[in-house]
Amino acid sequence: MKYKLFIFLLGCSPFLLGRIQDWLMMNLLGVPLLFLSVLMLLFWGYLSHLSLNLTNSDWKALILLNTPATIDLLLVLIQELGFGAYWMNRIGTYSQLFYLPLLPLGFRLTPWAHTVSPAYIAAFLCMIACSLFVYKKNG
């Protein structure tokens, strides 16, 4: 039971990483955003490997680790597509910060998009693909 909560909390780490990247972008010029996206995927791969070692089940690890990403994706899509604006509170702010490290990659994968939603979805799919790659490689 404890490992389930631990893996779920590991899945929440992009909130902190997004906040750190937000601070870097506000205080430093020339932050290499695409490089940070690649680092985030490498970190997510490490978390995927760690979660697999704790559960010994690909699907259980995938679900536990990516549940926060799924919930956050739903939150940002509801805000953008449903309400047409992001909430002006901590939930609205932190739901955007979760995917901030991967948004540069998401935008590169969706150059045709005129809204942020496809970039969020692409970022989410990159996280899932990264986890699946690690599970197949180690499984």
In which residue ranges do the predicted regions lie?
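Transmembrane alpha-helical insertion/packing segments
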Residues: 1-44
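Canonical alpha-helical transmembrane segments
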Residues: 36-64
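Hydrophobic alpha-helical membrane-insertion segments
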Residues: 63-88
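Hydrophobic alpha-helical transmembrane segments
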Residues: 102-127
